[in-house]
């Protein structure tokens, strides 16, 4: 005869809760997900939103643990990602992963024809000079270095083409076309497509910030002064009020940091002699001969 041990109902409320490092909420273990590589644990909802955001924005292909202080610097495996996102998001993740593999593979390159987008194989990987590459899909023959139509006996142009329009090959690239929907990053030359939004662009590959219209660097232009003058004036794509609010926030951050430094400077001046005195005493104690 088997007996079942009775468990009081009030014991159910004493089940341990686990804290999520993302939302700081406490949840039962059943609502948590553990990353296999580093054993960090988060609530399933937060981890799912984190993974979906990175994939939708195309920020990362190797999705790292959300904990910045993770001792093992773990990453989510593909099967873990597949269990928590929808099929279309997983398809986008695999596409981004493949694009990154081709980008860093010296044996492969993309066909520059905007209507093709096939992956082409380089014949001689060890060859340092430009070589002809023929796309097996559209049969276009192009240069492995500048991606223009193959030019035997001629060097590559000094200025690499940076924009092109849909339906055109790299031989018909536009150099100063403001309305071109696809351009190259001025720094790493990766193709970037802009559907809509503001003209301040950031390359997802090298994190370089630049103006979409003139390709000038915006890495140090925190206040977006570039759009107050010149040919790109008022082309940012945001209202004047939002630009003023952005500048107010940036100035506030710098002013707050300066104020903090100003308040802390007297304490630093007072503490400096004390620190120097302690160091002198320590060095003097090390130099004293040992008693015999």
Swiss-Prot record:
Post-translational modification: Auto-ubiquitinated.
Residue numbers spanned by region TRIAD supradomain: 16-236
Zinc finger (IBR-type): 91-156
Pfam families assigned: IBR, IBR_1
Record: residues binding Zn(2+) 2: 111, 116, 135, 138
Residues that hold Zn(2+) 3 according to the record: 143, 146, 151, 156
Catalytic activity: [E2 ubiquitin-conjugating enzyme]-S-ubiquitinyl-L-cysteine + [acceptor protein]-L-lysine = [E2 ubiquitin-conjugating enzyme]-L-cysteine + [acceptor protein]-N(6)-ubiquitinyl-L-lysine
Phenotype when changing residue 256 to L: Preserves membrane localization but is defective in self-association and ubiquitin ligase activity
Residues where Zn(2+) 5 binds: 211, 214, 226, 232
InterPro entries assigned to the protein according to its UniProt record, in alphabetical order: E3_UB_ligase_RBR, IBR_dom, TRIAD_supradom, Znf_RING, Znf_RING/FYVE/PHD, Znf_RING_CS
Bilayer-spanning residue ranges: 250-270
Quaternary context: Self-associates. Interacts with UBE2L3.
Protein name: E3 ubiquitin-protein ligase RNF144A
Organism field: Homo sapiens (Human)
């Amino acid at each position: 005869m088997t007996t079942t041990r009775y468990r009081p109902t009030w014991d159910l409320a004493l089940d341990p809760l686990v804290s999520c490092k993302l939302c700081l909420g406490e949840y039962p273990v059943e609502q948590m997900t553990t990353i296999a590589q580093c054993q960090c644990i988060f609530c399933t909802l937060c981890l799912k939103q984190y993974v979906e955001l990175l994939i939708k924005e195309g920020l990362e292909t190797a999705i790292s643990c959300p904990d910045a202080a993770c001792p093992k610097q773990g990453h989510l495996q593909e099967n873990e990602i597949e269990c928590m996102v929808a099929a279309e998001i997983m398809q986008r993740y695999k596409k981004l992963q493949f694009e990154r593999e081709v980008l860093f593979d010296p044996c492969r390159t993309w066909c520059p024809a905007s209507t093709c987008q096939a992956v082409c194989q380089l014949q001689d990987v060890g060859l340092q000079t430009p070589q002809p590459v023929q796309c097996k899909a559209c049969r276009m023959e192009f240069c492995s270095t500048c991606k223009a139509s193959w030019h035997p006996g001629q060097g590559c142009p000094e200025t690499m083409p940076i924009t092109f329009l849909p339906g055109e090959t790299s031989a018909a690239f536009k150099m100063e076309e403001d309305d071109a929907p696809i351009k190259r990053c001025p720094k790493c030359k990766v193709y970037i497509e802009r559907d809509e939004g503001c003209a301040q662009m950031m390359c997802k590959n090298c994190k370089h910030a630049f103006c979409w219209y003139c390709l000038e660097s915006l890495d140090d232009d925190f206040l977006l002064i570039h759009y107050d003058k010149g040919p790109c004036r008022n082309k940012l794509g945001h209202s004047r009020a939002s630009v003023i609010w952005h500048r107010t926030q940036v100035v506030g951050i710098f002013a707050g940091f300066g104020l903090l430094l100003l308040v802390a400077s007297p304490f630093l001046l007072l503490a400096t002699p004390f620190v120097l005195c302690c160091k002198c005493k320590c060095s003097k104690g090390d130099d004293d001969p040992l008693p015999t």
